[in-house]
Structure formats: C-alpha cells, structure tokens
Swiss-Prot record:
NCBIfam families assigned: mycothiol_MshB
Organism placement in taxonomy: Bacteria, Bacillati, Actinomycetota, Actinomycetes, Glycomycetales
Cofactor note: Binds 1 zinc ion per subunit.
Species in which this protein is naturally found: Stackebrandtia nassauensis (strain DSM 44728 / CIP 108903 / NRRL B-16338 / NBRC 102104 / LLR-40K-21)
A molecular-function term among this protein's GO annotations: N-acetylglucosaminylinositol deacetylase activity
Signal sequence interval, chain numbering: none
EC number per UniProt: 3.5.1.103
The protein's name: 1D-myo-inositol 2-acetamido-2-deoxy-alpha-D-glucopyranoside deacetylase
Recorded catalytic activity of this chain's protein: 1D-myo-inositol 2-acetamido-2-deoxy-alpha-D-glucopyranoside + H2O = 1D-myo-inositol 2-amino-2-deoxy-alpha-D-glucopyranoside + acetate
Length: 296
C-alpha cells in the first residue's frame, strides 16, 4: 500500500474522540495539508463515559441510554474533516474497546474497558496498521497519559508495545512485514507555555486555572529542557478551533482555546510541543534548541 501513499507518514494514537484536537490538532492539520505527508489518526475508544455539555443530549449518558459513543463517533468524523485527516481509524474497529472512565471508577471494570484490555492483543491491532502504512513517525502520550486518565495511560502502553512488536519479524507475520518506526514522540506542554497561559488568564472570568496557585500543581507540564520538538501550526488555528467545536458534547463553546483565540489571536492555539523518546533529533531552532519538524 505504501507505493500509493506520500513519502512521509505519521500515525497519531489517541484515547478518545476529542483528544486529537487539544494537543495535536494544529500539528495534524499542518501535516495533512502537505501533499507529501499522510496523516493517520488511531483512536482507541468511543468515549462512552464522557460528560455531556449539551443538555438536550444528556440522556445519551452511560448511566442513561448509554448511546454517547455513537454520537461521539459522529463528532470525531466531523473533527477529522475539519483537520483534513481522511485516514481515521478506531483501534480494533468501532466499539472494540470501551471508555474506562476516570481512575478508580466502576467503569474501569467494564468487560470491554480499554484499561483492562490484553496489552498484546490490543497492540496487535496497531501493529497491523504500522506494518500496513510503514510510518516514519508515531505520536502518543507519555507514561502518565498526559494527565493520568486510564485510557490515556493504556494508549501509551499499547503504542509502546506495538512499536516494539511491529519491528519483530517473529511476531504475527500474517500482519505484514516487520517495520521499525524511525521517530517516536510523546505529546507534552512546557511549563513556560503553561506559565504564560496562567498569567494571561489569571484576571479573567474564563480562567481554566481557577483554584490553581502554581503551574507546578498541575498534573501535566514538563521543564522546557525535556521538550525536544515544537510544531508551529500557524495558519491552521481555524481548523483546530473547528475541530474543537465539532466535539460539542465534550467541549463547551467558552472553552479555554476559544477564549485564548479571542484574547490574543487564533495563532496562539497552534503551537504544540513533543518529546522525542526514540529516534534521531533533527536540526534545532537556534533560539529554542527544539527541532521544528517531526520528520527532520
């Protein structure tokens, strides 16, 4: 299949519909607009346990009709359309794995909860995709799943396992020829960026950090020295915001990205950061010391 694909290929692995847009939306739109790059999104669950911010849809909740997953699948498709990502896939197919809910909740024990999925079995689904597409780049979360959600942590574990197994010619050869990903990234946010946002919103009625006294108290964010890569997706802010709006059940209209865009301009939402954990770093920007291209 790679004979018919562009020369550059990247796979993003996310836990739920809407996760693709917050931390990687501008990056995905930026590369999807490049005719020499093929972008694939793999999402692991339908997000059945999510909150609902549209009152008239409240009965779709897991505790009611339990139909939120199907609705969110529709939102996910609209989000991908906004980002220009045509190749979007559900790990194992839609509904193979269920949203596990927040840590230490009953949803963790659901028979189909992604949190309880057999790691090798789940990874094999991703191995098949990696061997089919043969991407140079794989992107997912850090070991804490960015902020500690069980499905984010499991998405990290599955991605790590799949990258290992995809390169092992002895593992499930029927899934395709072995393939080694050249560069493996985790999503992240540097504390300097959080500090800027913290200050920007400190006197705002729309403060997403309300009740937080320091960026060090947040469950995410790393020292700038840990960051290796920044993607400046300027020109793709409107695409990212359209992607955010597509997830209406999960992200209210007055979300912090929309507020930031209104306050300081849409381009402020398009800077996204990563940590390269496997592979060779590309040329660094002389000012930041960070590489500026996932494929460099």
């Amino acid at each position: 299949m790679t004979d018919t694909l562009p020369p550059n290929r990247v796979v993003f692995v996310h836990a739920h519909p809407d996760d693709e847009t917050i931390g990687t939306g501008a990056t995905m739109a930026y590369y999807a607009a490049d005719p020499d790059t093929h972008v694939t999104l793999v999402t692991c669950t339908l997000g059945e346990e999510g909150e609902i911010h549209v009152p008239e849809l409240s009965q779709l909740a897991a505790a009611e009709a339990d139909q939120l997953g199907g609705w969110r699948l529709h939102e996910w498709h609209m989000s991908c359309d906004a980002l220009g990502v045509a190749d979007r896939r559900m790990l194992g197919g839609p509904g193979a794995y269920r949203d596990s809910g927040m840590m230490d909740t009953p949803a963790n024990k659901h028979p189909r909860a992604f949190w309880g999925a057999d790691l090798t079995e789940a990874a094999a689904h991703l191995v098949a995709i990696l061997r089919e597409l043969r991407p140079q780049v794989l992107v997912t979360y850090d070991p804490n799943g960015f902020y500690g959600h069980p499905d984010h942590i499991q998405a990290h574990r599955v991605s790590v396992k799949a990258a290992e197994l995809a390169a092992d010619a002895d593992f499930r050869p029927e899934l395709g020829e072995a393939h080694k990903v050249s560069k493996f990234y985790w999503t992240t946010v540097p504390k300097s960026a959080l500090a800027t946002m913290f200050e920007e919103f400190s006197q705002s009625d729309d403060n997403p950090f309300e009740g937080v006294t320091s960026v060090d108290d947040l469950p995410f964010g790393v020292d700038d020295s840990e960051v290796t890569t920044v993607i400046q997706g300027k020109g793709f802010g409107e695409a990212k915001l359209a992607s955010v709006r597509a997830h209406a059940t999960q992200i209210p209209p007055d979300n912090w990205l929309a507020v930031m865009a209104a306050k300081v301009g849409v381009d402020a939402t398009t800077t996204e950061h990563y940590i390269l954990v496997d592979g060779k770093r590309g040329p660094a920007d002389p000012e930041t010391g960070w590489e500026t291209d996932l494929f460099a």
